[in-house]
Every structure is written in C-alpha cells, then in structure tokens.
Amino acid sequence: MVIHLLAIYGGLPYCLNNRVKMGLENLEINSNVYRYIEKTNPAKIITIGSGCEYPGYLDGYLKEEDLGAGKLHQSVIHYGYSKLMQLQLCYSFLQERGTQFEHLVLANMYGPYDRFDLHNSHVVGGIIYKFKEAMKNNDVIKLMGTGAAVRDLIYVDDVSEMIVRLLQKDVLSNRPLNCGTGVGTPISTLVNLLCQKLNYHKVEWGNASEDGALLKVLDMSKTKDYLNWTPETSLEEGLDKTLDWYFNE
C-alpha cells in the first residue's frame, strides 16, 4: 500500500505569492509518487486531497459529486488542480491495473506541529499565531473579514483515525471521500473561544469583502456511512490540545 501525504502548500498569502513554485513542485511530487506506484504496483493507494479541489463558485455543504464540476478558485488553483490530478491518476490506476484507492478530501486541519505564522498557516494556526504575537506587547489582533465566514475545522488526530480505519478495510471504495467534521464553525466563534482560553480580548475585525465564501463545510454523509464513524474531537478539546502544545513547546 502507498499513502501519499506529501505536498507543497500554505495559507492564502503563500498561495498568491508562490504560484510557480506550488505548481511545479506539486507536479514533481505527484510525478515521483505515481512513477513509484507504476513501478511497484501496490494493491492499494490512499491519497490526501483538499477542500481546494471543489469549484470556486460553490458555497454551502460540499459533496463529493461536486468535484470537477467547475473552475477552482483562482487563489488556490495550482494546489487544487494538483490534488484533482491525484484523484484522476487513482482512477487511471484502478481502470488499468485494478489498484484500489481512497482519496480523502481534507477540511481545514489543525493541531500540534501545524504551521503557525502569517504566510504559511491555515486559518486556525494563523489566528493562534496572531494571538501569541499580540500578547507579547499587549497589541490589538487585526483579523481579516468580519468573522461571519463559516468553515469546517478538523483536529489532526481525527484525520489520522480516518486513515487508520481505511487501512483496516479489506476493500477500498475507489472514490473520493470527504474528511472533515461536517460541522460549520463561524470564524467569530473560533476567535471568541481563543479569547476566552487565552484571556485576551483585543481583537479588531476587517470588512465584509474579506470574508470570502460565507459557508464552506464538507458533507460527511458518505464517509459516515462507509466507515460508520464521525470525528470525535470537539473544537474546544482540539484547541486546548493545540494551545497547550504551541505555548509550551
């Protein structure tokens, strides 16, 4: 079996400023991995995709059948298409060699060992970093948007658990599967929780034009039916573990 986790990725600033690097290096990574698969002919492949694979115009609860139904958002086009290419190559290996596969379409993952900075982090890591930096000098935390945007936030251990459950399957389903919580969390709720847990409330929001899509949550019905499982870590518990690691590493 091959489990393909490797990718070059980052937050929105990184994606916007490193399009060539992301495009070329993810092509090279995928080429090397699938050349290895071609050479070694494993029975099964598990690949990690991204919610960036979904069409940019979609807003709401995202279902696997929507993949490939439209153009990706310009801000993540290189990363998103590299993940869609993984999926298409999985289909090709299935058709030509009978190689079973599972392609996990990942929500916004967070947890210990995440990236915590201004340029390469995703939403949770980036906001936690802003809290830590502001708290050093009692500064105001300046955040993009109004906090109204709703996102699907999944703790890293739950992603690992889903992969383990797939490893225990004798036969894979040969399709993409969403890997999220299916629960939408407004960014304002995330920030309020962090304010309470860190006892720091100096937050300044931006404007509505920075919110992006107001609702992007992964529909988990197919995953739940297939694995008889849903993620177990609540946002509060996941944040507690993440903050404990980050502030005490």
Feature roles, as predicted:
Residues 12, 47-63, 78-84, 96-97, ...:
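Conserved catalytic-site region of short-chain dehydrogenase/reductase
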Residues 49-50, 87-115, 125-127, 135-143:
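Conserved beta-loop-beta element that borders a ligand/cofactor-binding pocket
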Residues 4, 31-76, 102:
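Conserved Rossmann-fold NAD(P)-dependent oxidoreductase catalytic core, especially the SDR/UDP-sugar
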Residues 127, 133-249:
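C-terminal substrate-binding subdomain of Rossmann-fold SDR/epimerase-dehydratase oxidoreductases
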Residues 1-25:
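NAD(P)H-binding glycine-rich loop region in Rossmannoid oxidoreductase-like domains
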Residues 16-31, 35, 42, 81:
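Catalytic Tyr-X3-Lys loop
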